[in-house]
């Protein structure tokens, strides 16, 4: 096989063609929803709204910005742990997310915000587009270091499409609750990415083994990603919840779950090391599993101690996964999972989906109040014969649909990405920025001397 | 003394036991407050609230997230300035804060949000838990590099307990104003930590002197912490202020104070260097003293120029402290204050407490308006014989109580932490990540060459 | 010429004198606006406001904090790309911004918030002060590495003054729309800075050429700045827009423009490299041009696809500028533009101004609705003979005024900064932190060994 990693024509053409197509489609289809349109001034009078604050903007803007930080800084920097792949981690994540949010506005728009003629966008669409791209960032973690930016654009194109369809099935047909996306974002993204990684299996990846580890400073950069994901996860899980108590509860639950998850991740990391030392990989990743695991139930009545339990379990399972499962997946199943997304998003996503099914099936009027139950599950819009038990079964169905879509979609996309002309690098050059980036020469002397002889002494 | 830093059983057992206890206590005691409960839907009708926006969530969520960033990224990265202690700074701060917020929800809950049967939590509890942990992060700065994570968990357990009691005395018994916590958070945290450091005095710490300095990049990581603390401090000081003008005023005052503080910190840093050069330690720390000093008065009528004066003074005092006081404390009083928390939190916290007493004692109807005065000091809830003078004296009393609690508590906790089996390192191994962390090997060649010979040239 | 870079007296005196003057002026002039004053409690009753949420604080606080992050972390870290100038980039940006916001509160206050006796400040003033300082940060980018902190303070003093006058002319006399400041902030700041750089031309700058490049990690630090600017730009462009739909629309438009800009920046960066490799300089800077270009039209009816087109064009033009224009400016016009602000803020700012003139001149009732049009352009406050065409011409006039003010002001300030006693460094010592900062010695061995021989093995 001839490896040609020179993207001089392929990458520019891909970017420009995609963007021109997006502009054309936006021109034909995308308009502002009422509360972002100047006609809102009249609408306020018609709807008898007392204040501009009733504009959706003020309910969701802070959460939106937090989610935005998670996608670009959170995921971007989390993946900078590799010693020579920092530019690509941050830069390709930036590229795929910037493309993905535009395509998601269209795909999700057609399926969910289409008024027959136009897609009407407001802040909720932007949040949902960020969410959709979040699942692509998850999948990127599985193939990190082994694909070209052109492959990433293609993967994003397909994954956003499949994500939107899967989301439509879950939210609109099965009417499941999944406000933080345990199923639609995390489980779907992880298993999609793992399937792609499986198809793209590289038998000689050990040739770039040396670059698969971190350095001292690359691990600190990665902690920037970890912490912004961890801190803003309450916003992630509450961003599109119902106004009022649901948003409030989702934030509290996620806060609790993540706190518990840190303690069990630390515990297991130390217990599984022969000298009791902590492993940065676990601290960077497993501590976040509590946010993933709470994605489905965040706005439901799990109670704070229920959230703690979920975080407790996810921290343990995720750390165990990093120690035992990732090597197993690579050696036995030929799945090379660079960032261990199976441990951070895969299993915790499934746990979240199961927790959602269980929590929904035990919902009752005592716990929620009569109006509260109707409001929480949107029953007035739904079938009359609604029951908690049925909701629970639909939740479980949603999990299976997500996994099935991820596996089938991952196979198809993986096969497309295996075509040899996307500019991928040979196995021995994986995890290396210099393949796709102009890299600065290191300064001759790395020492920054306080009394540099090249500096003229100042006059006294 | 036999030093055993292998935490393989001690750290996991401590984490898991604590977390299991927390889950049990949360299960028995913690429920959602009304505005995070599904019954809120009915409550809105009963209370005749016009909109979901009246949910406390929308008043405080942006401030909460900013405070959250300050605790985890702000304090965490501020301490990464040490050349070989970045993992521990960020990682142990992460661990103790994640444990501390859970324990604080319980302790503060029992004392302040207990309805006789349950602790009812909403967003304000989360903010207060973060605040409480902030004082532990301050104390951590004093002992940074010299304690094991097990010691930190124990210190957090006790300090959160003492903090909650002290806070209860100040806010509920003495009814002082301290919305940004000059007294409860900063002065208490600093003197508690310094007392612990005094008890844990290490006579041979000079053996790890070499690792007590920074490197070029570790200083830049620390600036991430500094800036997020600096930028979000207006949120910190306004997060639990009264709705409306008080929150608004607290943000403006803090913004002003911090801006002034930067100028005087820079001025003093340059003036105190024989060649007029700036010292990163001062820029990283003293610039923040203006936020600490404004913690008590932030929501009071100090006026913008009063805030500037406080910031002006704090910047000067704090920088002087780093240059003259820290060496004095170490050589004469045997207090080894790794991060100089005495200069950043100790003295400015006392200045803040005094400023609060003065500002309260000159409060009057001209300045606040009649309703404004009652609202600002919550007089309707308090004794009828309220007077500004009395309030001022209670404020001063609050400062003394905080200092007394810190000193007494610090001695007790210090003695407990001196027990030899918590996994602490010998003096010559302080400030070293490798004691508790798996550290990556540095790559053989640090040079990242643009034209790496190991990269196959792409086909033309 | 004798170069004396010892600032021991000059910098402290400058900082302290300026701060004392600011405190005096704040004491005489600055008070709280009504919604940050305790009399607000009564005001609510008088104005019949239903809720504390009507306090301006709740409309704008999240946007304010995002803008604050952009100024201090965004601009500060964006400039850390230089290998030996990270302390100065972050530190001097911190210093000039902290001084600038105070001076801007006064200058903008006298011109726009003066009630005859006092400047009444609220959150909007803080945002505007941050905006004003943003233009100084832009200018700083042009002279980065070549000026002393004393020069920066002087530049800030004058630039804030000129900015405020220019802003007054545009917003109050010409009544142009420029909520995100394409003209007032970006074009003004860039051409002011470039003119200063032109006057301060250093013929022997090639002597410090070696330090003008980046290192691997300095580029990652710079990406922190890039991403926080990119992510929070929707807040920047919407922060002072009208309540409701205008803020909402400005956020959506900016989000779209920035996303498109990333794709065209990547495309051009790859296409212009002989091996198709990406250049970090473009990814760090050109990706942001879409935010600059949308500054004037953000709240107008450009529609999402119009925003995409602006972002598309700005990404291309900006990347071309970095490749072709910056070398041309240096070699032919003797303008040494360290950060390439001409490409990121100059040309995109002009594009934004032109887009504003075009968009305003095609405004009509179909697009905005009758009340919407009046509200969007504030027509009720303005002359009766308002027409879109006239608005368009005033917008164009505003752009010319901004450019003229920048060039004339830049010449004057440049001449002042050329005086030889401000502590500037000789050409061969530019881009070097050690001139003004105490720099840590690099540790003897940079290797952090996992099994450090200096660490006593733990007892079994």
Curated annotation (Swiss-Prot), chains A, B, C:
Keyword presence, Transmembrane helix: yes
InterPro entries: Ammonium/urea_transptr, NH4_transpt_AmtB-like_dom, RhesusRHD
Places the protein is found: Apical cell membrane
Alphabetical UniProt keywords: Ammonia transport, Cell membrane, Glycoprotein, Membrane, Transmembrane, Transmembrane helix, Transport
Residue ranges of the TM segments: 10-30, 62-82, 90-110, 126-145, 152-174, 180-200, 220-240, 252-272, 286-303, 307-329, 347-367, 397-417
UniProt subunit comment: Homotrimer.
Species name: Bos taurus
Listed name of the protein: Ammonium transporter Rh type C
Transmembrane among keywords: yes
